[in-house]
């Protein structure tokens, strides 16, 4: 089921990313850079391990995990979090927890595009990615 997400994805649209970053406590300068950055996300599967690489002019990150198994993650904004990723109804649901807080990153396929919905408290951001050839 994760196979539907495999590929190289380029950000083409972003809504409310600044509000989401503000909610997380990301500083002004980093938010300015984050808002201008158009990252590429590469999703790979190797056996039962999923690898998600995010590449941009600002920062490159990589996580690898097994579905349903908690792992330690350092986010692009340098938060140290406990993460778990599950498949739920065709959606890849990634939950990060730290310091009593929680954020979710939900990836789903809609009309051949990868839609990433980021939620922290009342802040909801939608980012749309198109598959690269």
Swiss-Prot record:
Modified residues (Phosphothreonine): 8, 30
Binding site for (9Z)-octadecenoate: 127-129
Keywords annotated in UniProt: Acetylation, Cytoplasm, Lipid-binding, Mitochondrion, Phosphoprotein, Transport
Tissue: Mammary epithelial cells of developing lobuloalveolar structures and heart.
Residues binding hexadecanoate, per UniProt: 127-129
InterPro entries with a match to the protein in the record: Calycin, Fatty_acid-bd, ILBP, Lipocln_cytosolic_FA-bd_dom
Gene Ontology molecular function, alphabetical: long-chain fatty acid binding
Entry's localization field: Cytoplasm; Mitochondrion matrix
One GO process term, biological-process aspect: long-chain fatty acid transport
Principal cellular location given in the protein's record: cytoplasm
Phosphoserine: residues bearing it: 23, 83
GO cellular component, one term: cytosol
Sites bearing N-acetylvaline, chain numbering: 2
Binding site for octadecanoate: 127-129
Record function comment: FABPs are thought to play a role in the intracellular transport of long-chain fatty acids and their acyl-CoA esters.
UniProt remark on domains: Forms a beta-barrel structure that accommodates the hydrophobic ligand in its interior.
Family: Belongs to the calycin superfamily. Fatty-acid binding protein (FABP) family.
Protein name (record): Fatty acid-binding protein, heart
């Amino acid at each position: 089921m994760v196979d539907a997400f495999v590929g190289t994805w380029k950000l083409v649209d972003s809504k409310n990313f600044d509000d989401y970053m503000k909610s997380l406590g990301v500083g002004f300068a980093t938010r300015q850079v984050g808002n201008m950055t158009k990252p590429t996300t590469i999703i790979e599967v190797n056996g039962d391990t999923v690898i998600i690489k995010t590449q941009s002019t600002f920062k490159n990150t990589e996580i690898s995990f097994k579905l349903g198994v908690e792992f330690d993650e350092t986010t692009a904004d340098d938060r140290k979090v406990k993460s778990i990723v599950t498949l739920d109804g065709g959606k890849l649901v990634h939950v990060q927890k730290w310091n009593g807080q929680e954020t979710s990153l939900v990836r789903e396929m809609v009309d051949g595009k990868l839609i990433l919905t980021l939620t922290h408290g009342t802040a909801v951001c939608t980012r749309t990615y198109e598959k690269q050839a």
